[in-house]
Amino acid sequence: MEFSHYSVMLKECIDALDIKPNGIYVDCTAGGGGHSEAILERLDSGKLISLDQDDEAIETCKKRLARFGERSIIVKSNFSELERVLNELEIVHIDGVLMDLGVSSHQLDTPSRGFSYNSDAELDMRMNPRSPFSAYDVVNTYSEQELKKIIFDYGEERFAPQIARKIVLAREENPIKTTLELASIIKNAIPVGAAKKESQHPAKRTFQAIRIEVNHELDVITPAIETAVSRMNIGGRIAIMTFHSLEDRIVKTKYNDYAKACTCPANFPVCVCGNKAKLKVITKKPIIANNEELNENARSRSAKLRVAEKI
């Protein structure tokens, strides 16, 4: 199946990178190749490394970016392995990094991938289809306490205890195998009055939590930022697009940490730490999609783009 993905805030992302025609850039989440293509179109002698862990995305990118020849380097990898990828390519310094942390529209809209609570499929939710660990394993093997924790922490779901209890009770009868089966269990766990007040599907937050757990989505952000900052040339830009508050909080905090100079306690009369700021935060407030884009793609509504520059 052809991998399709709407490139959220395409112009904003490309402008944020302040691309140098001879620079070396990394698109950490290539998806359908939209952002990668736009970056390559601004390069002359420069190169772009496009990463993705999805086989279908890789094949789509190879076709879409073939016209750029050797300037396009496509690697099947999670961006948490950015350090290893750069080492294997013998690339020491880079000029910019783009990360789109959203689940691709292709993955969401392909029922067999098991991401959607609106279509019936086997419980899966793996961004890397070759990973041995899926949503089925989380739902059917995690303890009630573990389920409650991830649903509350990653889904910010206030009914996490009730949902975890219902899941455990249901799987005692039979393993929970499909997305609609799980969605029904979640719906029945939430009080009717509370569900009626919600504008979104009652399973949305729990599905998000399980997806994050399956793909270790939050765990990989910090090391990727650290690698990007350490490898970027002065003046290089890092642009990260997030789609929920947990991701955004990590990115904002990490940027601000790198933007700090002295980290000594406030009561120290002089600086003894010797720490120097490594980043200048370009976006004091995140960039969000404009109304025109929101009309084209409702999923852009939750996107936040934060940009920083190496100093």
Residue ranges of predicted features:
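S-adenosyl-L-methionine-dependent methyltransferase catalytic core, i.e., the SAM/SAH-binding region
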Residues: 1-311
